[in-house]
Amino acid sequence: MYTVDASVWVNAFDQREPGHLVSRQFLEVLRDQALPIIVPNLVLAEVAGAISRTRQAPVQAQAFATALSRLPHVTVRGLDEVCALHALTLAAQHGLRGADAVYAAVAREAGSTLVTLDNEHLTRLVNLITVCTPAVALAALTPPPQLPA
């Protein structure tokens, strides 16, 4: 199971961003293999806001975030009091921004791998949860090419 940070969804959406193809391929592999994704409901607002700001396309931003919420292999988890308190603890103990702590809390509670482009996730949480970039996650999901016999 995976928790996919908003940075990856936005990167996959925006062809102008470095690493776009890797993020897109990673999400396509998850979709094609019907691998479960759990994300905080916060991801919807973050993705819509980021796309709207960078592309000046509010209708497209809302459509993408809505489509994300309806993917059959994606579970959108609400931020209840238990998760919020868990995120609070992670933010305080690891110096995370609030939204980053919410993703970490969801990943930790679900026992999922957090896939992110956020350097704070990648450096501050390595001893707490499994966290990696889309490139690392994609490499783990994609079998190496077969050499001719």
Annotate each predicted stretch with a short phrase.
Residues M1-V39, T54-A63, L138-A149:
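Short, well-structured N-terminal submotif of metal-dependent ribonuclease cores
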Residues V4, I38-V39, G78, G98, ...:
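Short beta-strand scaffold positions
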Residues T54-A57, H94, V131-P134:
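Short, hinge-like loop/turn segments at secondary-structure boundaries
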